[in-house]
Amino acid sequence: MSYPGYPPTGYPPFPGYPPAGQESSFPPSGQYPYPSGFPPMGGGAYPQVPSSGYPGAGGYPAPGGYPAPGGYPGAPQPGGAPSYPGVPPGQGFGVPPGGAGFSGYPQPPSQSYGGGPAQVPLPGGFPGGQMPSQYPGGQPTYPSQINTESFPSYPVFSPVSLDYSSEPAAMTQGTQGTIRPAANFDAMRDAEILRKAMKGFGTDEQAIVDVVANRSNDQRQKIKAAFKTSYGKDLIKDLKSELSGNMEELILALFMPPTYYDAWTLRKAMQGAGTQERVLIEILCTRTNQEIREIVRCYQSEFGRDLEKDIRSDTSGHFERLLVSMCQGNRDENQSVNHQMAQEDAQRLYQAGEGRLGTDESCFNMILATRSFPQLRATMEAYSRMANRDLLSSVSREFSGYVESGLKTILQCALNRPAFFAERLYYAMKGAGTDDSTLVRIVVTRSEIDLVQIKQMFAQMYQKTLGTMIAGDTSGDYRRPLLAIVGQ
């Protein structure tokens, strides 16, 4: 069986970040590569990282927790939404809590990087190559000190069948975003349209949407430069003065360079009291090596802080070690598959979990943090044949809390990354209230990468289109740009 690899995807690098200690919260003049013919943008325009969380959801009630997954894989759960096509229904991925609005952003002194994770010895295989006849220990008992208020009952993916015949075309034919560079693009003309939309009394939000939601991120950077050249004003400051709430968050996110947006989001997730762990998981466990390395550099230069040290100070235990491994950006990205290694890794993972009392967490961390996604898919198939239980189910049995969510996110992305984001979007809108920050973040960050495939998986998994669910869960000026981006 072949295991098609993921083509390199993601955000284009931004090679020239400003030095540490820069005052502005957005790239200052002369640092990011702006197009020739336009002067570089000034700093200080983007909203600075708040003391905690994302902007409020504009009156929506805070999203509540979802019921915990029940039992092990088997019959579909009644009422649940399907996980991947052709497999039992799952319950999905939780959403981070909301937070306060925008506020000032401190500029602390720069910090140096810490050391990377140490090499972890792997346990050996089974004696004589034979599998244990029973699973010793049964269901693990989780530590009693875990605070259930800190670990709400978020839904998680149901384990999936390893039938790769149901994989979408995106797995073998590349992925596509819904936003493409506009033809006959004229930055000066677009700048003039935006100026007229914000001039005088009132704001023409539709004109803003027509421009912003139909230009690529690179074209938006050119529009910003053209706006300052033509009018001597900062476009971002003008937009902030004219917009508010979720509409403001969405439009400003679209104008941030992708690497900066990820770094800015990570800083917000760890700023102030509390940590948005699921935001850390969503970014660090799904990005490519190049994207992660660019995020680390941008985080240091923009905020004068070391990402790894912030992770260490805001997380702990095996979850901390997993995220530190992720922020190294050292996953093997070779698209070929070593089937012998896959078999050996499957045995090691079994012996580190189901095949012993307790769990060797370091073995799971090492394999899931270093192997390529095609290699992990082969390992998952070998594990399923060997253990008569899929690896996602075993992770659920052996781990709990955010480390479980992080490990499962890696495996879910190895199987089908668009399906992972489709489920995140579904549970951001399911039930009372909307997790608008998750909705905005995924729609914006995937709009030029794989939002086409995410839409396809969403419709296949939930029997409704992404646009239909967005239209029913949002309203007004905020709804229009979201629908324009997803292609409704």
Swiss-Prot record:
Start and end residues of each stretch annotated as Disordered: 1-49, 71-150
Source organism per UniProt: Macaca fascicularis
Comp. bias regions, Gly residues: 89-102
Highest classification ranks of the organism: Eukaryota, Metazoa, Chordata, Craniata, Vertebrata
One Gene Ontology term of the molecular function aspect: phosphatidylserine binding
SUPFAM superfamilies: Annexin (SSF47874)
UniProt modified residues of type N6-acetyllysine: 233
Domain-related comment: A pair of annexin repeats may form one binding site for calcium and phospholipid.
Function: Calcium/phospholipid-binding protein which promotes membrane fusion and is involved in exocytosis.
Keywords: Acetylation, Annexin, Calcium, Calcium/phospholipid-binding, Repeat
Name listed for the protein in its UniProt record: Annexin A7
Sequence ranges of Pro residues compositional bias: 1-18
Annexin repeat coordinates: 185-256, 257-328, 340-412, 416-487
Start and end residues of each stretch annotated as Repeat-rich region: 1-143
UniProt region (3 X 5 AA tandem repeats of G-Y-P-P-X), positions on chain: 5-20
Highest taxon above the source species: Eukaryota
Stated family: Belongs to the annexin family.
CC terms in the record's Gene Ontology section: cytoplasm; nucleus; plasma membrane; vesicle membrane
